[in-house]
Regions:
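Extracellular/periplasmic carbohydrate-active domains that bind, remodel
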Residues: 1-171
Length: 171
């Protein structure tokens, strides 16, 4: 399934579970397979978060969250297809197999849940920050591709990779 952001900013494109509820049955977990998120590319798109997982015991299999770095002229750019974060996981015991998150303007992935596991994480940081001032926070230059909350005591990431090429302002 393809979830395509529209021109009006969406706070969240797909939300699994109610925030802070975390209700789920470990013997019958929620699963998402082959879900693709697109912000920009063929047309202007805007969203604050692409995927937010609030339930426990969720399986994410082949998720691709993409803020466009190319496409139809006028459909992408730092101020055009805005998107803070690709994936936020708040649930416990969430497993992701094949998590691809690319070009978001803040943390690409934030993992707040306990006992999370990701097997294969692929990431490209945004190519298009206009300058360093636009791409920093709290005295930190840039944003992490995969941020595990300081409060999390157990998390595993197997086969993670991230790379970046700043092509607008390489300073």
């Amino acid at each position: 399934i393809m979830i395509d952001a529209g021109t009006v900013n969406s706070p969240v494109l797909l939300q699994v579970g109610t925030p802070h509820a975390k209700k789920s049955d470990p013997s019958n977990p929620t699963t998402l397979h082959d879900v693709f998120f697109r912000i920009g590319g063929p047309h202007v798109g805007r969203a604050t978060v692409s995927l937010e997982v609030n339930s426990d015991n969720v399986l994410l299999d082949h998720i691709w969250a993409w803020r466009a770095d190319h496409g139809v002229d006028g459909s992408f750019g730092w101020e055009v297809n805005t998107a803070d974060t690709g994936v936020i996981v708040n649930g416990d015991n969430v497993t992701a197999t094949g998590l691809f998150v690319e070009h978001y303007q803040k943390y690409n992935t934030i993992w707040n849940g306990e006992n999370g596991t990701t097997i294969l994480f692929q990431n490209e940081l945004p190519y298009d920050p206009p300058n360093q001032t636009a791409y920093q926070h709290d005295g930190v230059l840039g944003w992490a591709a995969y941020k595990v909350a300081d409060s999390v005591s157990h998390h595993e990431l197997w086969g993670g990779g991230s790379y970046v090429v700043f092509n607008v302002n390489p300073t």
